[in-house]
């Protein structure tokens, strides 16, 4: 009898929750239409997986890619609409949020074709992989539009949980298990510190959770200069720092990059930084409006440490993925310059533009690494020696992406860094920009060292896998080559005509 009553209560509670969710989607669904498309794609993938066999695997890639493209299309159709706050203040839709959502969708769209051959060769479970990627993308999109503390905590947790599962996807690999454990433990610790900072904001503002209402609450309670706000600022900086992975919050990055499957690393290396940058700009700029000098100082320290440590340690690496891990730490230091500058001197516009170029440069580099790794089974930098004689297209693509990451003209990375540094210089960040210029020269050194190895190097201890390298055809149906070509083109051409991109980015004020 008791069990029967409990069962009825459970059914009634579940029905109420379902009806409330249906009511929210019915009246607010148009505000999150791109996200609803992703949810529909997730449900469709689950249904097809439960009713089909492994022969339908190509359909999984098609559905995932189509879902992402449709979501991008819906996002573009919504461009330039009036800012809207929906779901009782939990979610905000405006141009600033939408351009970050576009970048996340773009990352995921490019990462799926990059992963196809890797999944086929390693015999990984395809459905779960795509489900995790789409769910992480969904979490990142909700994070970009988050307008209250609860959503700002739940959305990154959705992204992070999928990231942990993806990083440990190759369960038989000891390095992957070690990387996942470190990633999970440090991620959990950082999330607890982040929510601790949120609790101080909540209490200091008189129980407000919406970002703008927190500012009003701090004014009413006269707590905007209190020690509690300083504690909240430090805690939230540490929590967001783990997602952005600047120094000294970068300890997990090299191990996760080296131990995780390469397509997963490609996905995490860009989407996590885009989503974290979107949330960082809103959190620092709105609730901590009265503490701008303090958070500027904190971010300047993080940027300096990231640019110096990231680029110097990258020189000593022998693994390609670990080198890119430390390189990404240096790159996030450049992005932080744009966050510090803010709207005053087009800082956000330059940050968004550089982020777009960074996506193409980084994913192009990882596409080359995936292709080379599948044919050789090695990740060691010395094994790339003389690759130009074996596969000129792959070597040239890798060289262009690395040169663009280093910021050599006339590639996209050069113009992105140039505008970013110029905005920082106009804002008076002379020391920070000088450090950025010097560390960019350091990064060019280790990128050129690899390119020299690609073009002229000869390795006397070359492995049998590299010696028997199978050259890819000039025209290939391989999806990796498709992603690689798109990223290489995007890493070179936009730098010459970047004014339209900057104009769009300048129109994303919130």
UniProtKB/Swiss-Prot annotation:
Membrane listed as a keyword: yes
Membrane topology listed for this record: Multi-pass membrane protein
Molecular function GO labels: NADH dehydrogenase (ubiquinone) activity; quinone binding
Assigned keywords, A-Z: Chloroplast, Membrane, NAD, NADP, Plastid, Plastoquinone, Quinone, Thylakoid, Translocase, Transmembrane, Transmembrane helix, Transport
Gene Ontology process terms (BP): ATP synthesis coupled electron transport; photosynthesis, light reaction
Keyword Iron-sulfur: no
InterPro entries, per database record: NADH-Q_OxRdtase_suN/2 (IPR010096), ND/Mrp_TM (IPR001750), Ndh2_N (IPR045693)
EC number(s) given by UniProt: 7.1.1.-
Catalytic activity: a plastoquinone + NADH + (n+1) H(+)(in) = a plastoquinol + NAD(+) + n H(+)(out); a plastoquinone + NADPH + (n+1) H(+)(in) = a plastoquinol + NADP(+) + n H(+)(out)
A GO-annotated cellular component: chloroplast thylakoid membrane
The protein's assembly and partners: NDH is composed of at least 16 different subunits, 5 of which are encoded in the nucleus.
Similarity comment: family membership: Belongs to the complex I subunit 2 family.
PANTHER family: NADH DEHYDROGENASE
Role noted for this protein: NDH shuttles electrons from NAD(P)H:plastoquinone, via FMN and iron-sulfur (Fe-S) centers, to quinones in the photosynthetic chain and possibly in a chloroplast respiratory chain. The immediate electron acceptor for the enzyme in this species is believed to be plastoquinone. Couples the redox reaction to proton translocation, and thus conserves the redox energy in a proton gradient.
This protein's name: NAD(P)H-quinone oxidoreductase subunit 2 A, chloroplastic
Provenance organism: Dioscorea elephantipes (Elephant's foot yam)
Recorded name of the encoding gene: ndhB1
């Amino acid at each position: 009898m008791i069990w029967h009553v409990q069962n009825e209560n459970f059914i009634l509670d579940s029905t109420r929750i379902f009806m409330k969710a249906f009511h929210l989607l019915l009246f607010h669904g148009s505000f999150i239409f791109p996200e609803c498309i992703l949810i529909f794609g997730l449900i469709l993938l689950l249904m097809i997986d439960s009713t089909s066999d492994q022969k339908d695997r190509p359909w999984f890639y098609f559905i995932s890619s189509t879902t992402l493209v449709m979501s991008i299309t819906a996002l573009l159709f919504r461009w330039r609409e009036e800012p809207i706050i929906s779901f009782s203040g939990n979610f905000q839709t405006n141009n600033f949020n939408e351009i970050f959502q576009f970048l996340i969708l773009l990352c995921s769209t490019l990462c799926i074709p990059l992963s196809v051959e890797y999944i086929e060769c390693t015999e990984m479970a395809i459905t779960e992989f795509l489900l995790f990627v789409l769910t992480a993308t969904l979490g990142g999109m909700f994070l970009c539009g988050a307008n209250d503390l609860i959503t700002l905590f739940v959305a990154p947790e959705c992204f992070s949980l999928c990231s942990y599962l993806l990083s440990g996807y190759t369960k038989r690999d000891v390095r992957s298990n070690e990387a996942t454990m470190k990633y999970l433990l440090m991620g959990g610790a950082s999330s607890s510190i982040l929510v601790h900072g949120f609790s101080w904001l909540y209490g200091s503002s008189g129980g407000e959770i919406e970002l703008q209402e927190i500012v009003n609450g701090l004014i009413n309670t006269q707590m905007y200069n209190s020690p509690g706000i300083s504690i909240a600022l430090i805690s939230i900086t540490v929590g967001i720092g783990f997602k952005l992975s600047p120094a000294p919050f970068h300890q997990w990055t090299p191990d996760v990059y080296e131990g995780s499957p390469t397509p997963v690393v490609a996905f995490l290396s860009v989407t996590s930084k885009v989503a974290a940058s979107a949330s960082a700009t809103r959190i620092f700029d709105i609730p901590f409006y009265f503490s701008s000098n303090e958070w500027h100082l904190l971010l300047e320290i993080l940027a300096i440490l990231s640019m110096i440590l990231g680029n110097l340690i990258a020189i000593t690496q022998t693994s390609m993925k670990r080198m890119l891990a430390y390189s990404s730490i240096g790159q996030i230091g450049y992005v932080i310059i744009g966050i510090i500058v803010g709207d005053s001197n087009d800082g956000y516009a330059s940050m968004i533009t550089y982020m777009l170029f960074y996506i193409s440069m980084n994913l192009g580099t990882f596409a080359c690494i995936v292709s080379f790794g599948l044919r050789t089974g090695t990740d060691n930098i010395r094994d790339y020696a003389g690759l130009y004689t074996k596969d000129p297209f792959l070597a040239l693509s890798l060289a262009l992406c690395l040169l663009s990451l280093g910021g050599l003209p006339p590639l996209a990375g050069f113009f992105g860094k140039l505008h970013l540094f110029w905005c920082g210089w106009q804002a008076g960040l002379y020391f920070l920009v000088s450090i950025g210029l010097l560390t960019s020269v350091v990064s060019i050194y280790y990128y050129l060292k690899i390119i020299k190895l690609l073009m002229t190097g000869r390795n006397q201890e070359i492995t049998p896998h590299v010696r028997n390298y199978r050259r890819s055809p000039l025209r290939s149906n391989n999806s990796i080559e498709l992603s690689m070509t798109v990223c290489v083109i995007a890493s070179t051409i936009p730098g010459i005509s970047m004014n339209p991109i900057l104009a769009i980015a300048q129109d994303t004020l919130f």
